[in-house]
């Protein structure tokens, strides 16, 4: 990821990555994301006051009140977070067979069918989608069809550590647009269909 070191040192140690300012604490890197409703660059100073080690920004902010924080500027903080998260968790998606299913309709049904077939063939499958996360008898709910990149990479690591050899996921158009799947190298891609539901203006 091309970047500019605005201040501080590239040798700054980071223990974890956050994009929710409420989780700010010493030793963390806070990625400032421009969302649809809020721009988390607004919370950079608050996070610095709480002791975060690194700020990742995509547009200039006033740094006068945070001289001790390492600040890195990138073109897209969402894209940067996706690659940073992959590196943080050891790029687990590269150590499993990755299958992505995208399209306007049919993603959930298709992923469940693929999961059933693969498991019948003896594969250990972790699945992420509209109905949540499934792996080896575990299930947990998700807020989005395609979770944020940090949660995705963390989940892939959980799959791998649990013994999964295959990761199967629904890839939403929003997930693609918002760089949630950036840095993931899919072995197999499945395209179901395209309808006006997913064709926006322009």
Residue ranges and their predicted role:
Residues 1-83:
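N-terminal leader/targeting and accessory segments in enzymes
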């Amino acid at each position: 990821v091309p970047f500019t070191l605005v201040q501080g040192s590239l040798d700054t140690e980071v223990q974890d990555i956050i994009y929710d300012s409420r989780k700010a604490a010493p030793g963390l890197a806070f990625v400032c994301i421009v969302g649809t409703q809020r721009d988390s660059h607004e919370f950079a100073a608050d996070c610095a006051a709480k002791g975060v080690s690194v700020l990742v920004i995509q547009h200039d902010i006033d740094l006068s009140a945070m001289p001790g924080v390492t600040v890195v500027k990138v073109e897209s903080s969402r894209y940067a977070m996706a690659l940073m998260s992959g590196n943080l968790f050891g790029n687990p998606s590269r150590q499993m067979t990755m299958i992505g299913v995208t399209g306007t309709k049919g993603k959930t049904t298709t992923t469940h069918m693929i999961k059933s077939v693969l498991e019948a063939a003896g594969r250990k499958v972790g699945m992420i989608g509209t109905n949540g996360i499934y792996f080896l008898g575990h299930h947990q709910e998700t807020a989005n069809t395609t979770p944020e990149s940090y949660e995705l990479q963390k989940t892939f690591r959980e799959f791998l550590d649990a013994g999964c050899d295959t990761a199967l996921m629904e890839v939403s158009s929003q997930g693609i647009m918002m760089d949630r799947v950036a840095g993931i190298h899919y072995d197999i891609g499945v395209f179901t269909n395209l309808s006006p539901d997913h064709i926006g203006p322009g």
